[in-house]
A protein has these predicted regions:
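Arg/Lys-rich, alpha-helical DNA-contact motif
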Residues: 2-12, 16, 26, 30-31, ...
């Protein structure tokens, strides 16, 4: 049995916690950056981990004056870079073990 706690936030609470206006959240959802449960803004339920993504999206939009399409692309590229870095680290560790056993 898992002890994972899942916290869901309604639109009002999500906006408060992320410190972004509802109009931003609607744009973020419309561009597929986050995907809440529910079919309309008043019924949307967000997972708490989506707060970080929404905050990043709003910051990119505001600070770099990116359109929402550009924000979505930038976040996808950031995620891909993070995945590649993690894979690179795993491969370095495997190589280190291989080289270590070959020299021993």
């Amino acid at each position: 049995m898992s002890n994972t706690l899942i916290v869901q936030l309604d639109m009002e609470r999500f906006c408060e916690e992320a410190n972004i206006p509802a109009t931003y959240v609607i744009e973020i959802v419309e561009h597929g950056i986050i995907e809440p449960q529910g079919h309309a803004p008043d019924a949307w339920r967000f997972e708490d981990y989506e707060l970080l993504t929404a905050k990043r999206a709003a910051k990119l939009h505001k600070d770099l004056e990116l359109e929402w399409e550009g924000v979505a692309l930038a976040l996808d590229l950031i995620e891909e870079v993070q995945q590649l870095r993690a894979e690179n680290q795993r491969l370095k560790q495997r190589l280190g073990r291989f080289v270590g056993t070959a020299n021993g």
